[in-house]
Amino acid sequence: MASKLSKDSRPTWPRRAIVTAGMPYGNKNLHFGHVGGVFIPADFYARFLRDRIGRENVLFVSGTDCYGSPIMESYRKLHDEQGYEKHISDYVEANHESQAATLAGYDVEPDFFGGSALEPAVHVHEQMTDEIILRLKEQGVLEKRATKQFFDPVAQQFLNGRQVTGRCPIQGCKSEKAYADECDLGHQFEPEELIAPKSALTGETPELRPVDNIYFDLPSYLDFLKGFTKKLEGNETVRSVVVKTLEEWLNPPQLYIQNKFREAFDAIEGELPPHTVTDPEGNKSSFTVTFPSWRERDDAHEVLGAGGVRFRSGKALVPFRLTGNIAWGVPVTDECGCSGLTCWVWPESLWAPVSFTRTALAADEQAGGTRYAAHNWRDWWCDPEAHVYQFIGQDNIYFYGIAQTAMWEALGWNMQQSTLVANYHVLYMGKKASSSSKTPPPPASELLDHYSAEQLRAHFLSLGLGEKPVSFSPKAYDLRETGKNPDGSPLLARDDKRVIDPVLKEGTLLTGVFNRLARSCFYGVAVKDGDPSTVRTGCIPAGEASTEAAEAAEQAALAFEQAMWRTELHRALGVCDAFLRTANKRWSDASKAAKAVQKDDQAAGDALMHQALVDAFLELRVATVLMHGIVPAGCELICEHFDIAPEAFFSWEHVLNSTDALVESLGEKPGTHRVKELPPRFDFFSY
């Protein structure tokens, strides 16, 4: 902490807060990226907010994304190839239960983890979908469009999104997979732009046939989105990857054409809609054609195709599709202007957290209404005193930052725009994680066979994924050859004692530092037969902490709070690391000095030990509050041995106060609050 922080410059927190975590598809269990890149950070933040602004003022919601073509295609393969006989809803529910169990294994505790197609949220979500689509229609921002959809002439059926594969047409995209109208990096495009389409059902090249769908007029919000994005620049709470990604989508509609097609382009340029041409600069291999709007750009596709000119599209706003014709989806009311349609999974997944909020609030109200401070969902999503924090992966910034932002504005409900806490990819062994690679990453649940939840929570939070992609390289799965065994067989890194496991780095802070400080405090005041020391009262010692300890605790709390406000979670952990190590050293030095004096002067030594324990208890208490969201189980165990109710112990109302003040707030006299006795050789953190 380079400069001293002031209590007068603390951040302002919302009155109420929603925390969401990106929803995993219902066709599989969670992979480590889901847990380490989204759910653990969201859980950390939600736990912090509960302590900071009150448990009743925080709702952490997430759930399984039950609908959509990925689920349909996975279910179809399971049904056709492996004879799975249950309904698709049973398939999704089984995966949902596996996801919930995995999250519980990592001590991730949403207030509500539901499913968009599952009870108790399913009918609330259907109602929410109707309300939003009809409201957008009322606002005049929906449009019925006849667009083209892939049709397999061999299978004689329309193909849903994941039943068509090809290459992404967006300029500069490095996606390995593209589907009917989006790639796996989140780029949106028209089906006719997909390069080399192939049916996943038959392997044949599908045809394009016209279908009617409902679209949200996203391009009309270009100026609004430009202004919104401009305001985010320089905002300390917004990660740079969010602003950078939003800006990429706010360009005019453009096509990129390789120079080798210039002659063919020149031959048909007169047939194109209004446009401008920008010649390539330097050694660039393509020139740029810019259009006034997406309509002119789309009209140009047919002309260019007829002229034999191949092209790639630039990122730009296009109408955002709300509906589709797949059977497994949220039904869309015929009042929208089309009949027999379902909602496309991406838009309905954007308002699914609102549906989950409504479901959780209704359940609490029915049970007596004591858990949450307000039971109207608008008090959480539409009130300027409330705020929404959405933890997502970088690939989903377009949907949450572009499409959702514009739709929320279009609704006219005063929907509060979210803070998007977007993380870069978690790499695996230094490379992008892929289930088809030579060393596929393990499922998140399997990691718990090798590491504790707290080791993994601390490690994932240390990676700093808000700043860059970082590799997750657990030694337990490291198959690199690092030498030879005595019998001449290859020695793998996972079995090599010389290889350090990076996952365990943060765990040593818990076992070697945090654990020692906690043990020292509780054992230090424990009543011990035959020990003449006056500090062994079984109670938290009364008295003011030293200036050094009090200032260190205050500065740590303020720095931690600032880091959390900026959603710099790895820096918040870094504050805890530095504070714990300093506190542990302070205790070590002070207790050694006290013991040395006790040998010759029991009273003087006891006075020094008393002060050392006052300092240590203060620093342990503050560290436990700060670390609560990072390693909740161990911190709650420490709280249990303080023998103070968690709602009082973890509340930030007391974090900057002395320990005497906390004890007095309990209605007790300082020096009389008894701690829970610690059994011999007890560890709060041991792995």
PLM regions: where:
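A broadly conserved sequence feature marking short terminus-proximal activation segments
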Residues: 98-179, 221-222, 226-234
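Amphipathic alpha-helix face/heptad-repeat signature
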Residues: 38, 506-513, 517, 545, ...
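Structured secondary-structure scaffolds
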Residues: 2-53, 59-62, 127, 198-527, ...
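Basic, alpha-helical terminal appendages of large translation-related enzymes
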Residues: 1-14, 145-150, 163-186, 192, ...
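Extended, non-catalytic structural segments that build the interaction scaffolds
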Residues: 162-172, 176, 477-482, 491-509, ...
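Active-site-proximal binding-pocket segments
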Residues: 495-496, 521-539, 544-575, 579-599, ...
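A non-catalytic, amphipathic alpha-helix used as a structural packing/dimerization or gating element
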Residues: 44, 90-101, 131, 509, ...
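A charged helix-plus-loop insertion that forms the helical arch/lid used to bind
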Residues: 74-94
